[in-house]
Each structure stands twice: as structure tokens, then as C-alpha cells.
Amino acid sequence: MNIRRALIGMLSAVVAAALLLGVTFLDVNLTSDVEPDLSYRTLDYDVMVLKNGDLKVTQHIDMKLNDRGFDWKQMYQQYTLKANNLTNISDVSVKDVTNNETYVQGRFVNPNDVTDWNAEYAGQWYIADVSVLRDPQPFNPETDGLKADSSSDKTLEIGWNIPETASADSLKFDVSMTMHGVSTAYDDVVSFQWEPFGTTNQIPIGKVAGKVTFPDGVTKKNSWAWLHTLSLIHISE
């Protein structure tokens, strides 16, 4: 069927945690009495639904790093590939907004195994298959994504190597990627379910904002969106 025509017919979304789909914004404020080692001051999502149903996602992250007794070197996020809602991740890019530096692609490496971190690996990002604990493997989006009929899942890690840092009150990064296989096409509609961050997330986030744009022809009158959350949070449009 024509994906673009179906998208115009209807786009529905069930979002777990903190995102309102559409062209409006949603703000979430979370508070905690415990000062964590790592926290996100803000997390802003810019999401574009492509004509083929894929999602182009950019995260604008402002993080705080407290002194934990040893340097920070590697930041990362993990994603689960499933045949029914996320089959691949490609087009990854990472920019250090604070220092106006675009990171280059590298490979996963354990910081504990590196003598001169700043000279050898700082300023690089990586994507790895971490499905097997303690055995990260290279991941190539062109060949290693899931097929639509796959019965097995994969866990991907997208990470970026920062210069050795004892602490930082504010570090800003833009992390972008394209998520494939997130939409389901029916006879007259296309739907997708997206979870910006899951129930296993352990990083406190001070404020989350999300903006989603759709292809031309999708309007408030021919699309629907739902927000689901179990968090005790303040939500505003």
C-alpha cells in the first residue's frame, strides 16, 4: 500500500513516558532529593516522521556530571531492536555543542583498556551490538538490522567518547539517528508506538520537551495521538 497516503489517512501513537505527538510541545519536570552522578538537565526531542514511516530523531541533551572519584570518558544509550517496532538504526551522528565539535565514527572500546584516552578515542562515537553481555560486536546498519519476520531481538548501544572529565556543570550534545521499522501499515491507517525512554532508564531528567512533525497532508483533523505515562510528573502543552 502507499505509505504516504496511509500516513495522511491517520497516524496514531502510544507513547510511554514523556512525549506528545504533533506539532505542539510537551514539557515534563521531574524532581529528586538525591544528587546523582549523572543527570540530564534537559532532554529535547526533535522528531520527523518520514514519508516511508521511519523516524528521524534528534536529541538535544544538556547533561550534568558530578565528581565520582574517577574521570568520565564514555556516554551511551541502549536500544532494543524488535521485528514489530524497531528493526534498525542508521544515520547516527553526534555533535559536542558545548565545544562545537562534530564527533567521527569509531568503534567500541573499553576505557579501562586505553592508556591515552584523549589522544586515541576522545571525539569518536560508536554503534555496537551488545546483545551478549560483556561481548560487544560491531554493528553495520546496512547488513545487521532485523528482518520483518525475525524472531530474535538485538540490543544496540550508541555511545560517544568525551575527553577525560572529572565533573561538568553542563555539557551539551546533539545525538541524531534514523529509526527504521517503527510503523505498521494497515489497509487504511499507519500507526506507530514510540517510547522515548523506557522503564529501565536510571538517569534522572530535569525537563523533557518533544516536538514531532509529520509529512505534508497530516493535520490535527486526520491524525490521533495518545500519551501514556506512569510517572508522577507535570505535563503542559
Question: PLM ranges: what are they?
Answer:
Residues 2-232, 236:
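Lumenal/extracellular ectodomains and adaptor appendage modules
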